[in-house]
Structure formats: structure tokens, C-alpha cells
């Protein structure tokens, strides 16, 4: 049937159905279905399913009904799928997640394919029909979280799922929240895959928890996906948008890619995110392994269903992530030592400069202190001078007052003398006395002038007798003239001595001549 059906049929419907179907073995239908059928119908299902006997999986895209068989539910599902795997756009929530209808717990479901926004425990989205418990290659765009225990292989595509099983070698774009469960399912699909990564996914994510389980790495980018650890997994290459929640205990390999992780972290886990050109190393808590991750993390929250649903028992808390942290290459000891030496030299230079400035400031301080003391002493001296000046002013005032009193006393005496001057006659003795007094005054003035002249002569002689300046040409001429004078005086003295000797010799000769003449006269007589 391929149309709009508002009645109830037992056959697979391929359109919009709002009736209630009876239990019958049907085949998968394609289209939009709003009825409740016992089989995996394709389309929108809003009905309540009856308990069918045995059905086959539907392969349609949108399914909003509640299916009770172990077949897959394809499409939009607004009911609760107890135990079935859908391959459509799933907005329903499986057993442990959000529930829009009240149903009992169901066994493990298969993978949901296509575009899933539900939060199943672990459902691998398959574009086609899948009836077995083993997960097949998912092909689609899934925002749901799937729970399955089937082993999964390398997946490729864009994944927004949240699973608990680990798929080895999944490559694509993962935005789901990945949990942990036993035995990964082999997934191999197209660009949008419900890859449920069980360990540290690509991007710069390296979660670590206290539970020692085997951890793997994934190369790619994880956004919005919570990744949990699985017992055995391998490297997955996806563009994952999930937040890792693995509990890695064994040594893990380096991851490379682009990741945006949720800050919900395990108690002892730490996630380091770096750019694609930087390599960092994070160590796990209570483990002995480290993982070098290279990628870019934007730290977004994982997709957690809102509603009265129970969280999967196998899921662990997500690990915290450090956002946008960029670390460069590690510094070597030689570089560190060179930096320390450089800083030491700079510190010594600054210390010497500081000591020089401190010495100069100390000298200035001493100078200021000395000048302050000098100013203080000068101020004291000025105060003393002010006191002396005040005392001198007082004495001068006293002298002025005394002089004024003396003038007051002399003025009447002078007046009386003037009055009596006309009547007094001077005697001869008084006149002589007056002349003698005037003569004494003249002699005293002359003596004073002579004393002043003598002082001038003495000063002139002292200046002349002092050491003469040899550079003065006048002094040199004076020396030459003095030498000539000395020579002339010596010649004069020598000539005077010779004159005396000549006179003596002439007297002796004269005396002998006279004696000879006397002797001759006596002889002739």
C-alpha cells in the first residue's frame, strides 16, 4: 500500500496511516506511516503497536511509531522502541533514554541508520534494513545515541550519535555521545555515520579515567560526542563532535584531527586540546600511559536526553577538556640556562646601576644634611645678630637721650655766656693763653700731617724693598744700571787707591832726591 491510510491494516503500509494494524507478518513498507503495525514500517508512526508475531525490518526513512519486534525502526520515532533497530530519522528514545511513551525495558537494539536525534543506548544507524544483532555499516546523519553490543568496524561519515560500544577505525564526523560496552560492531558507511567511538576521539582529546580499560585513539574531529572506553578498540578516523568520556589505562596512540568536546569529564580524566600544528602530551589519572593528541577542541556538551530516562549503566562521566590551549615546543636546558645567565647579567647590571645611584643619592643626602646644619647655624647666628642689633639700638637710643639731655643743659649756659661776654675784659695772661692754645692746635695738625707722610713713605719703601718682578723690563734696566754703578764705584775706589800710592811714591822719590842733592853739595864743598 503506497498512499495515505487512516484505517487499520495488517499489511505493510507505504503512506500515512492513522489506524491500528493487527498482528500479521508483513514486509517492510516505504513511505509515511502514522499507524501502529507489528512490523518495521517506513514513515511516521504515531500509533500504538500491537504485539506482532514475527515481522521483517522496514527500510523507510521516517518512522514515528513504536515497534515491538526485534527488527529495525527506520526514520523518525516518537515512540519508545523496546528492542528494535531502525534505519531512519530517529527522534524516539530507546530503553535507557528519553521516553515519550511508557513501555517496558527491551533488549539490545540494532543500529539506527540515517539521521537520528534520539538517545538510544547504542544504535548504529543503517541506511538500509538491518534485522540481525550484528551492526552493519551505518549510512546517514545520526544525532541519537545507540546501544548495541555487536562488534563494529571502521566507519566513515558524519556521526552525531551517542553510543557505548567502540568501533575500531571509524572515520567521519561524530557529534554523538559515545558510551562504552563490550564488543564493537563493524560499521562501514557513507559520510554521515552513527560512529560510536569508545575511546579518545580525534582532535586534541586525551581523556583519562581511573578505571583501567583498553583505550584506543581516533584521528579526526569530535564535536558534541561523549566517548567512553570499551574493552577492545582500535584507532578510528572520524570528524567527531563528541566529548570523550573514556577511562584509558593502557598506553594509547596519538590522535590527529578536529574535536569539540563537552566539559563533562570523568573525576580523574583530563583532556588537552591543541591546534593542528601543536603536539601536546597528557597523562591519565591512575594509569601509566600518555597520549599525544593533535587537534582543535571547542568543548561542547554531549547529547544527553532530557526526560525521565535512565542513563546507560556502562556509560562513564565525560572528561573535562581544556579549550583553546596552545603550547609551543618544550624549552631545552641549554635555552633555560642561557636565559638564566642573561637574566643574571641584566640583574647584576641593574644592581651596579642601582648601587651607583644609591651612592650618589647618599652623597646628595649628606650634602643636604650638611647644608641643613649650616642653614641652622646661620639662622642661629642671624638670631644672635638680631639680638645684638636690638641691644645696640637700645644703647643708641640711650646715648641720644643722654645727648639730648646734655644739649638741654648746655643751651642755658651758652645763653648766659653770651649775655656776659660783653661785660668781661680779657687780661694779658688770658690773651697769651689764647695764643698758646691756637699754636698748640696748629702744631698738632702739622704733626698729624707728618705722621701721615711718614706712613706713606714707609709703605713706599716696603713696596720697593719687596721681591722685584723679573719679567718687568724696567726692573731689568734697573739691574743693569745698578751693575754699572757698582763697576764705576769699584773703578773710583781703585783709582783713589792708586792715587794714594802714586803720591806716596812721589814723596819717597822727592825725599831721596833731596838727600842726594845734599850729599852732592857736601861732596863739592
Swiss-Prot record:
Region named 5 X 2 AA repeats of F-G: 6-144
The cellular location(s) given in this protein's UniProt record come to: Nucleus, Nuclear pore complex; Cytoplasm, Cytoskeleton, Spindle pole; Nucleus envelope; Cytoplasm, Cytoskeleton, Microtubule organizing center, Centrosome
Residue positions with a glycan: 471
Which residues does this entry mark as bearing N-acetylserine? 2
- Describe the processing and modification events after translation: The inner channel of the NPC has a different redox environment from the cytoplasm and allows the formation of interchain disulfide bonds between some nucleoporins, the significant increase of these linkages upon oxidative stress reduces the permeability of the NPC.
CC per GO annotation: annulate lamellae; centrosome; cytoplasm; Flemming body; mitotic spindle; nuclear envelope; nuclear membrane; nuclear pore
Reading the lineage from the top rank, the first entry is Eukaryota
The record's annotation in Pfam families points to: Nsp1_C
Which sequence positions carry the modification called Phosphoserine? 411, 421
Has keyword Metal-binding?
no
Q: Specify where the region named Disordered lies, as residue ranges.
A: 260-293
Q: Where is the composition biased (Low complexity)?
A: 269-293
What is any one GO biological process for this UniProt entry?
Answer: regulation of protein import into nucleus
Q: Where is this region: Required for centrosome localization?
A: 331-461
Q: Where are the sequence repeats?
A: 6-7, 46-47, 78-79, 115-116, 143-144
Keywords carried by this UniProt record: Acetylation, Coiled coil, Cytoplasm, Cytoskeleton, Disulfide bond, Glycoprotein, mRNA transport, Nuclear pore complex, Nucleus, Phosphoprotein, Protein transport, Repeat, Translocation, Transport
GO MF annotation list? Hsp70 protein binding; Hsp90 protein binding; kinesin binding; nuclear thyroid hormone receptor binding; phospholipid binding; protein-containing complex binding; PTB domain binding; SH2 domain binding
**Where mainly found?**
nucleus
Q: Which residues form a coiled coil?
A: 331-461
Q: What InterPro entries does UniProt report for this protein, alphabetically?
A: NSP1/NUP62, Nucleoporin_NSP1_C
Q: Key word Glycosyltransferase present in the record?
A: no
Which family is annotated?
A: Belongs to the nucleoporin NSP1/NUP62 family.
The entry's free-text remark on domains says: Contains FG repeats.
Free-text function comment from the UniProt entry: Essential component of the nuclear pore complex. The N-terminal is probably involved in nucleocytoplasmic transport. The C-terminal is involved in protein-protein interaction probably via coiled-coil formation, promotes its association with centrosomes and may function in anchorage of p62 to the pore complex. Plays a role in mitotic cell cycle progression by regulating centrosome segregation, centriole maturation and spindle orientation. It might be involved in protein recruitment to the centrosome after nuclear breakdown.
Subunit text: Component of the p62 complex, a complex at least composed of NUP62, NUP54, and NUP58. Interacts with NUP88. Interacts with NUTF2. Interacts with HIKESHI. Interacts with OSBPL8. Interacts with CAPG. Interacts with SAS6 and TUBG1 at the centrosome. Interacts with MCM3AP.
The name this protein carries in UniProt is Nuclear pore glycoprotein p62
